[in-house]
Amino acid sequence: MAQATITPTLRGDTFASTFTEVAHSNTLGLRNNEQLRLFHLSVQNNHFDHTALVKFLKRNVGRYVFSRAEYEGYKQRDDLEEVALDAVNRMRSQQDGMGLGEILLYVLLEQILEAPKVMSKIELNQARGQIHSRCDAIHLLTPDGQRTTSSIVFGTSSVVGNIGDAITAAFDRVVDIEQNRSDEVQLAEHTVFTKTLDPATASCVKDLLIPKPGGAPVFDTAYSMFLGYDIGLDAKNYDNQQYRSALDQKMQVDIAAHAQR
């Protein structure tokens, strides 16, 4: 039987012009599959291009904040002009200080890992009852040519000035999520019986997490972290080409120093 899947929500056609990937050869040394990817914003005249980032986020903030069912409602009402403003207002009403990290976590999970959103942090906050989610996102990674089992991906984000502090904070949260993994899975299960998910996504999550009579659910859990930190370079000390090279080299050195600590 074909593996059920859910559709991506991100509009990522301008991702490559907004973010620049930095090549490196470091790994975390894990037994299971892993990805360790480095990105920075595109650079113009020794400064990060925040204008491109803002435009990219405006295109996607509604897709991040609202469930597929809610977003489809805007389409049916021919009211997509209101999506971004309504999404920002909902984020402000729930803001916990980590909004940028959470939305960039969503972007990278969908664009790079190709793991569609099940629930964002905003949706988790909306849906929670007696169960408090410790993660910033729940996404679904389905089988491909190498993976034979689906994975529920629990995401967390950490945006602080120092890379070491960002890593420590993120891993502390992963440990907390792992220790309460059954609660996180149960929260995902509960969404199937609410109006939070659209019918197609609810059916996919139900098939994955809730065993049929005489059967058992077959899925793994995985973790994803988004880390944001201050690069610590003084742009005045470099010409344009030197700055781009120094930026890549600094990030390569940073990840090499922390990858397998």
Regions from the language model: what does each represent?
Residues 2-82:
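A structured, charge-rich N-terminal accessory region that forms the first stable segment of a protein
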Residues 43, 47, 91-99, 127:
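Short, charged/polar micro-motifs that form catalytic or ligand-binding hotspots
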Residues 49, 53, 97-105, 162, ...:
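Short amphipathic alpha-helical segments
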Residues 67-78, 97, 187-191, 261:
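Short glycine-rich, low-complexity/disordered patches
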Residues 77-94:
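A short, surface-exposed helix-loop junction/capping segment
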Residues 100-133:
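Extended, Lys/Arg-enriched charged tracts that mediate electrostatic binding to polyanionic substrates
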Residues 118, 126-207:
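Glycine- and acidic-residue-rich phosphate-binding/metal-coordinating active-site segment common to enzymes
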Residues 168-260:
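Acidic, metal/cofactor-coordinating or nucleic-acid-engaging core segments within structured domains
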